[in-house]
């Protein structure tokens, strides 16, 4: 089977599918640049940032990939009430992902920040609360 036939079959089947993605969503943020020198304050590289980007991570990435296939996608997840959530919502809207199943909590929206110098990831910062969901949020 050639690639065009495969694309046609996937597009036809996906367009008729409705899928609910349930899981941990996250915002992946990347800061890229060039290492220019070592800091005089501590033996760590100083990176001159030349670019930034944000992408959907975790279950949000799964929903995005399904939407790219033409599937009608809805997502159910927990997020915080913060700027990172706002970024996720903007990305859901622009990709046609239904986020009516989103539940706001007092936890931060899970965000992973990666610092990349040249072609090497040098650092990852995780903003998340890994404790189990409980109380009223679990009921929702």
PLM feature spans:
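Substrate-binding N-lobe of the ribokinase-like
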Residues: 3-9, 40, 44-111
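Structural beta-strand/beta-sheet cores of well-ordered domains, especially the beta-sheet scaffolds
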Residues: 23, 71, 111, 121-123
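Short hydrophobic segments within beta-strands
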Residues: 22, 76-78, 116
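Conserved phosphate-binding/catalytic loop of the ribokinase/pfkB sugar-kinase fold
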Residues: 104-107, 115-140
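Short, flexible, mixed-charge acidic loops at enzyme active sites
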Residues: 32-41, 116-119
């Amino acid at each position: 089977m050639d690639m065009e036939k495969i694309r046609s079959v996937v597009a036809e089947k996906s367009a008729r599918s409705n899928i609910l993605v349930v899981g941990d969503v996250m915002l992946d943020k990347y800061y890229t640049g060039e290492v220019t020198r070592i800091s005089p304050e501590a033996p760590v590289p100083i990176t001159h940032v030349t670019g930034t980007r944000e992408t959907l991570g975790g279950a949000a990435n799964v929903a995005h990939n399904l939407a790219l296939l033409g599937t009608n996608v809805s997502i159910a997840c927990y997020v915080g009430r913060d700027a990172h959530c706002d970024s996720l919502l903007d990305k859901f809207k622009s990709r046609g992902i239904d986020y009516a199943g989103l539940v706001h909590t007092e936890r931060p929206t899970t965000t992973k920040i990666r610092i990349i110098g040249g072609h090497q990831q040098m650092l990852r910062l995780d903003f998340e609360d890994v404790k189990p969901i409980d109380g009223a949020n679990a009921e929702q």
